[in-house]
Design a protein with these regions (language model features):
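Short, solvent-exposed loop/turn and secondary-structure capping segments
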Residues: 1, 40, 45, 54-62, ...
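Formylglycine-dependent
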Residues: 1-62, 66, 71, 75, ...
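Substrate-binding rim/cap in mid-to-C-terminal beta-strand-loop elements of soluble/periplasmic
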Residues: 1-10, 67, 139-140, 175-302, ...
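A structural signal for well-ordered alpha-helical segments within the folded catalytic domains
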Residues: 17-24, 78, 122, 129-136, ...
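Secretory-pathway/luminal and periplasmic proteins that interact with or process carbohydrate-rich
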Residues: 35-36, 51-57, 160-171, 298-305
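Metal-dependent active-site segment of extracytoplasmic phospho-/sulfohydrolases and closely related
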Residues: 38-42, 90, 94-101, 130-168, ...
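Structural recognition of the beta-strand scaffold that forms the well-ordered cores
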Residues: 42-47, 152-156, 221-223, 239-242, ...
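C-terminal, low-complexity/hydrophilic appendages and adjacent surface loops
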Residues: 209-217, 221-237, 310-358
Length: 358
């Protein structure tokens, strides 16, 4: 359904914010469905832009995290790792992968620039909490309708690992990286000042992205992030499932391997609907995914998937029955300059004139 743009789009006193509008319209739609039919099942696909760049959020959200990241990304990564052990997400004897030399040590960042970097993560955190808040509004609406216990909710946080495309410095405008424009952190600060300074970092006047080392911390315990499909830091995302009517171990963990292509078959099985063979008169290929309903209701269920291939920009991996084969190309995610890309340019030759591929 089209959300539309309100007349007061540029109202400074009450600015329009798309994530909030998404929640408003989703709630409106849910109440409309129930008003028409008290028993009709419903399906909502709520896909927020968060936490993809640009990181846009009002200061009232970002400011909640002032000072929360002054310890820097190295310490933050250690803190996250400790919490993961407490939660049982990683084994108690697991060791944290070391920082790659591509990421600067927080202690090496000049003191005058640390507030610049810390604000980047404050904005990202506020952006993330706002998304969580709006999802919560939709879930509260489902509860108000009396349907929460019997509704399967899949909350998938992301479509890849945290993005390192903000480069080492972070950027007041994410398009600088995409256009191969190298900027130092001091240049980023100077350019930010032209648009109102760091207090405007999450505002609509900028298109900000945080520094790659913050993404590295966010991807704890993994090594890399988005674009590096050879490693779990590039492909793995948290998923929270809520279905009180069928699950009995609230807060339980699952270790069975699953892939995003398994979501649709799972939803169809839960709804008791066969996969469509025809859509708009076009015959459909069989779905490649496999339902994970078994592991959803039983933590000891056997693996439903034993193989999966991954590939992103030449980085590739193969999961096979508990093992992961990986091959990473020697390019870090934020390097798009001509000299770097030249190493990966395709070759060409005429096999008639050059049979030996010289």
């Amino acid at each position: 359904k089209i959300i539309g743009t309100p007349e007061g789009f540029y109202d400074e006193d009450d600015p329009y914010y798309f994530p909030g509008a998404m929640a408003d319209r989703s709630i409106e739609w849910l109440h409309g469905v129930r008003a028409q039919d008290a028993h009709k099942p419903f399906f909502v696909y709520y896909s927020t832009g968060c936490s993809h760049a640009p990181h846009h959020v009002a200061n009232e959200w970002a400011d909640k995290y002032k000072g929360k990241f002054d310890q820097g990304w190295d310490k933050l990564r250690e803190e996250i790792f400790a919490r993961q052990k407490e939660l049982g997400v990683v084994p108690p004897d697991a060791e944290l992968t070391p920082r790659n030399e591509a990421f600067p040590a927080w202690d090496d960042v000049p003191d005058k620039l640390k507030p610049f970097y810390a604000r980047q993560m404050e904005v990202y955190a506020g952006y993330s909490e706002n998304a969580d808040h709006n999802v919560g509004r939709v879930i509260n609406a489902i509860e108000e309708l009396g349907e929460l216990e019997n509704t399967l909710i899949m909350w998938i946080w992301g479509d890849n690992g945290a993005s390192m495309e903000g480069t080492v410095t972070g950027s007041f405008n994410e398009l600088t990286m995409q256009n191969g424009i190298p900027l130092t952190d001091e240049m980023q600060v100077q350019l930010s000042e032209r648009y109102g300074g760091m207090e405007q970092w999450g505002a609509s006047i900028m298109a900000p992205h945080y520094g790659a080392a913050w993404a590295w911390a966010g991807n704890t315990p993994f090594q890399w992030g988005k674009q590096v499909g050879s490693h779990l830091g590039g492909t793995r995302n948290p998923m929270v499932l809520h279905w009180p009517a069928r699950t009995t171990d609230a807060g339980g963990l699952r270790s069975q391997f699953a892939h995003v292509i398994d979501v649709a078959p799972t939803v169809l099985e839960v709804a008791g609907i066969p996969a469509p063979r025809m859509v708009d008169g076009i015959e459909q290929e069989p779905m490649h995914g496999a339902s994970f309903v078994g592991s959803l209701v039983d933590y000891s269920a056997p693996e439903h998937r034993t193989q999966q291939y991954f590939e992103t920009i030449g980085n590739r991996a193969m999961y096979d029955d508990g093992w992961l084969w990986s091959c990473r190309i020697q390019r870090i995610p934020w390097k798009f300059d001509p000299e770097t890309i030249a190493h990966f340019a395709p070759g060409k030759w005429n096999p008639d004139d050059d049979p030996c591929e010289l």
